[in-house]
Curated annotation (Swiss-Prot):
This is 3-octaprenyl-4-hydroxybenzoate carboxy-lyase. SUPFAM superfamilies: FMN-binding split barrel, UbiD C-terminal domain-like. It is an enzyme of class 4 (lyase). The lineage of its organism: Bacteria, Pseudomonadati, Pseudomonadota, Betaproteobacteria, Burkholderiales. GO terms for biological process: ubiquinone biosynthetic process. InterPro entries: UbiD, UbiD-like_C, UbiD-like_N, UbiD_bacteria, UbiD_Rift_dom. Prenylated FMN binds at I180, Y181, R182, R194, W195, L196, R199, G200.
Amino acid sequence: MKYRDLRDFLAQLERQGELKRITAPVSTRLEMTEIADRVLRAGGPALLFENARHNDAPADMPVLANLFGTPRRVAWGMGADDVGALRETGELLASLREPEAPKGLRDALAKVSMLKAALWDMSPKTVRSAACQEIVWEGADVDLGRLPIQTCWPGDVAPLLAWGLVITRGPNARRQNLGIYRQQPLGPNKLIMRWLSHRGGALDFRDHAQAHPGKSFPIAVALGADPATILDAVTPVPDTLSEYQFAGLLRGSRTEVVKALGSDLSVPASAEIVLEGHLLPADDPRAVAAAVPEGANPPPATGYEMALEGPYGDHTGYYNEQDWFPVFTVDRITMRRNPIYHSTYTGKPPDEPAVLGVALNEVFVPLLRRQLPEIVDFYLPPEGCSYRLAVVSIRKQYAGHAKRVMFGLWSVLRQFMYTKFIVVVDEDIDPRDWTEVVWAMTTRMDPVRDTVLVENTPIDYLDFASPVSGLGGKMGLDATNKWPGETSREWGTPIHMDEAVKRRVDAMWDTLGL
């Protein structure tokens, strides 16, 4: 699907019957979550709440939910016709990450054409004026309370800004970083920026704090960017390519950006809303001293304004622990005329992150095959919180091969550093079919011999099951047929019906009255 911006994408969804306008008044507090969750679980359309109620009053703008509520809409957002076509997106990413030597003149010309399109033809286009800056709130006019930010779950500490595209740039970075990080409002102009230490935004901030200690760090947050740009932020785009460039490749047109009004950051020109501001040094007059609740650990000594974030209901299906994160002070809010507020919720799968995982699974397969050619297929079950459990089928070639694949998966892409469980099966097993996977595990595994346990590895900070926050164990399960050297016993022979018998029964089937 080709489109210009979010509004064009929504118009096309509506023509396809994939967008439902809701005119009844619906509250941003809990009601939207319940409605969106029921619709997502039924495989229903994206939702545009045209009469949202916020803080017991009519909201200033409509709220968009469930935009990526089905794998097909994710594929459309990435410029593909269907989920299967995302394998081609993965092939493109694999080629851009690690180009192979051309196999001949024709192949060389094709690779030159691809690189030209990626690195030159689709470089972002900077414009002087943009729709995202048609309206500007500054100074005392900045009020996050006027945005219809959802309160998703009864135990949430506050509303939650969940689809903000966070734009940063470190002092040594060749390009900007785009990331999706949740943000907790603290007041009319402050948000807690919850990013994990290994994420691009956090790394940019760390480098800035080391290079320019005591200096404020500029940030922009885009809400309602075009789908390709949003999805790029959760896709393993090569470090040599900007997310804006890759979004252009997916969309089929250059991404238009505009310089932020208060910094040198480039923001999506068609975004519905943009928040501009800084992370402030702790001694800045605008910074607020951290309030430490009784019994809580004090904030880390970063030299910057910090606050205790959470708890919030998360994609794990549980409320997460509180932790300290930097505070984003919003200097101005720019927006389009009649803006749309893009929102979501996270909860026990399936939710939008789980649906994204199903679609992005197809992108990952070619990337993994480039590093591990023996991989036949790869599956991240959505019930596993999108990334915590993986099942991979391989063409086994030697004893111990499954263990090599386990450690390869944990190392190849940053997306899998938090995968706790990896199940490796042979190519005759469909990793997407639990009946086959369980059969392989129960017939081809010895629990002692074929289980790999690794201690003290990086783990998602939201994983309260780990003994230490951010550090825990991993398990690999080798459910492949065992080769000489892995067993001293004669291995079982699978049962298969004779093909000639199957053909004879096929021929007589219609006469059997079954």
